[in-house]
Design a protein with these regions (language model features):
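Short FAD-binding loop at a beta-strand-to-alpha-helix junction that anchors the flavin cofactor
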Residues: 1-20
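Short, well-ordered loop/turn elements at secondary-structure boundaries
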Residues: 5-6, 25, 66, 245
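Active-site phosphate/pyrophosphate-handling residues
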Residues: 10, 27, 91, 263
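Internal hydrophobic alpha-helix adjacent to the cofactor/substrate pocket in enzyme cavities
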Residues: 24-47
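Mid-to-C-terminal Rossmann-like scaffold of FAD/NAD(P)H-dependent oxidoreductases
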Residues: 41-95, 99-102, 108
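Short alpha-helix boundary/capping segments
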Residues: 20-23, 84
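Extended, charge-enriched "interface" segments that sit outside catalytic cores
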Residues: 76, 82, 93-263, 267-270
Length: 271
């Protein structure tokens, strides 16, 4: 959000090539945070592509540029399962609390939700159910009976089951759900159920994001005179010089930068 020409001058919205609506609001938030950090000292606040749609938007503006007013569509994000609307508070509240933007009471609510959600997940991961106690109920729910005992987690994975309808079949699960604060019961149970049912997809996407994030930690800004690296393609030299990406991962997302160009930079860095 900070212009390269004038230090401490931050822009947001249409001047950056986006619409003036939600996209501008998101940029304004990040620009304001970083303007404050610049004045008082500290590391820049950067949201990753796996942390927030604002992170996707800003990264696209920096690495790809725009030919028409940019709109933030979910299709632009490669980590849509990690950027679900149901866990935005989990992803971002702690960051805002650390910067003084979220108050203590909001942070306490987040911790309460996380602890209750995780307790439910731990319970279903460790609690075993036996066919003779649950099969008649499973058949009424329209799902196949168990042929042998298994963890309750595996039963929750079935599309016909929910934590609530299984709690009617498993008294111990009902007792666990009753520990959740009554005022937030529906919200917290839903959060736990989503993590359980989508666990395989979430883990798979997180592994991919973690691999990319390792490249995000390799900083290259200011380390190269790209025009002097003759082994880079002409297009790569021109675009890397113009954009001056912060990290290897950011460089890899610039249109026209090939995997071989990235490998050359990694070799020069001794990686």
């Amino acid at each position: 959000m900070e212009t390269k020409q004038i230090r401490n001058l931050f822009f947001a919205g249409q001047i950056n090539g986006t619409t003036g609506y939600e996209e501008a609001g998101g940029q304004g938030l990040v620009a304001g945070i970083n303007a404050h950090i610049n004045c008082h000292g500290g590391q820049p606040f950067i949201l990753g592509r796996d942390e927030a749609y604002i992170g996707v938007l800003i990264d696209d503006l920096v690495t790809k540029g725009v030919d028409e007013p940019y709109r933030m569509f979910t299709s632009r994000a490669e980590y849509r399962i990690l950027l679900r609307q149901d866990d935005a508070d989990m992803r971002l509240t702690e960051k805002s609390y650390q910067m003084g933007l979220a108050k203590q009471d909001r942070y306490d609510l987040l911790r309460e939700k996380k602890e209750s959600r995780d307790a439910i997940i731990r319970f279903v991961e460790t609690y075993s159910v036996k066919p003779q106690y649950i099969n008649s109920g499973l058949e009424k729910l329209g799902t196949a009976p168990l042929s042998h005992g298994c963890k309750l987690f595996d039963v929750v994975l079935r599309p016909q089951t929910t934590l609530e309808n299984l709690a009617d079949l498993v008294p111990a699960l009902r007792a666990e759900l009753d520990k959740v604060p009554a005022s937030r019961k529906e919200e917290i149970i839903e959060a736990a159920e989503i993590l359980i049912k989508y666990s395989g997809y979430i883990k798979r996407e997180q592994i991919i994001a973690d691999k990319i994030n390792r490249l995000e930690n390799i900083r290259i800004k200011g380390k190269f005179d790209y025009n002097s690296i003759q082994s880079l393609s002409t297009e790569a030299r021109q675009k890397l010089t113009r954009i001056d990406p912060d990290t290897i991962a950011q460089a890899s997302r610039i249109p026209g930068i090939s995997p071989s160009d990235i490998n050359i930079l990694l070799v020069l860095l001794g990686r």
